[in-house]
Amino acid sequence: MKVKVIPVLEDNYMYLVIEERTREAVAVDVAVPKRLLEIVGRERVSLTTVLTTHHHWDHARGNAELARLLPGLVVLGADERICALTRRLAHGEELRFGAIHVRCLLTPGHTLGHMSYFLWEEECPDPPAVFSGTGCPVPTCPTSPCPIPLSLTHPTPQGMHCPWPAAAHAWRAQFSRCTRAWWRPWAPCPLRQ
């Protein structure tokens, strides 16, 4: 599994996840479809599916144009407000793209229909990936080398609106303690089971 991180807008990202054996690709949070298609062409992959974390424009505005340019493209997400949605996903649902497994995790907080995606390949030495959209208030979370307990990265809606900067320091301290204690490279990943 190869993940291409694509910076877009001023402070956002899209992702292209490539199944290296079949050259099938899945995009996550399409905001700028032309930029994504440039990379799809450069990587020589077949883009078949879009996973959308939530309906906000900076994560979903490119879905309609991409679906128009790629007939048959499947657009997935948990919220019916997502542009060009083909099928709604349920919490705990699992998908497969070649050797890549996807576990869909409803993570409301930023929006009610926010969904995160946990991706992994069996018998692959590469670490799994979590795509949390805007559900992760901890700046280091998306690039963490390990799966992170969702209770830390997806607080309640009330917790998302806590005062700063004191709350930010508390979250960082809690995240740091938990990550050091929780992650062990030799331990099985609880989200894969």
From Swiss-Prot:
Q: Give the superkingdom in one word.
A: Eukaryota
Provide the leader sequence positions.
none
Cofactor, how bound (note): Binds 2 Zn(2+) ions per subunit.
Name the coiled-coil region(s). Answer: none
Membrane-spanning regions, if any?
A: none
Q: Which residues are involved in binding Zn(2+) 1?
A: H54, H56, H110
Give this protein's Gene Ontology molecular function annotations: hydroxyacylglutathione hydrolase activity; metal ion binding
Q: Under which EC number(s) is this enzyme classified?
A: 3.1.2.-
| Binding sites annotated in the UniProt record for Zn(2+) 2 | D58, H59
Q: Which CDD domains match?
A: hydroxyacylglutathione_hydrolase_MBL-fold
So which cofactors does this thing need? Zn(2+)
User: What keywords are annotated for this sequence in UniProt?
Assistant: Hydrolase, Metal-binding, Zinc
PANTHER family the UniProt entry points to:
BETA LACTAMASE DOMAIN (PTHR11935), HYDROXYACYLGLUTATHIONE HYDROLASE-LIKE PROTEIN (PTHR11935:SF77)
Q: Which family does it belong to?
A: Belongs to the metallo-beta-lactamase superfamily. Glyoxalase II family.
Q: What does this protein do?
A: Hydrolase acting on ester bonds.
Q: What is this protein called?
A: Hydroxyacylglutathione hydrolase-like protein
What species is given as this protein's source?
Bos taurus (Bovine)
Report the gene name: HAGHL
